Amino acid sequence: MKIVVSGGDGFCGWPTALYLSQKGHDVTIVDNLVRRDIDEELGSNSVTPILPLEERVAVWKEVSGKDIAVEIADLTDYDAVSRIFRDVQPEAFVHFAEHRSAPYSMIDREHAIENNRNNV
């Protein structure tokens, strides 16, 4: 089955993409990588280093022999999402894309607006 996982760089999306790939599904991750920008802006890092998405996908292929496609795109970009759906033709869409950063949204009004705009 062809499956798109949005938010595939995140806490829930990444392991879900791995699980689905391991089960034999054709997985495409869609992520805008905004979580990494927010963490950098907040000066917040993971307790354990997290490799960039492209590197993690390469390691997954090395250990499993399975490919996971990656599309860097914002779900609020209609043209990008339309192209991805046209190209991939998924049979399922697993949606984990979200801002999970309350501290980011409380910096000021502009950050709160951006958090809500991009929290599809």
Annotate each language-model stretch with its function:
Residues 1-120:
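N-terminal Rossmann-like NAD(P)+-binding domain of SDR-like oxidoreductases, especially those catalyzing
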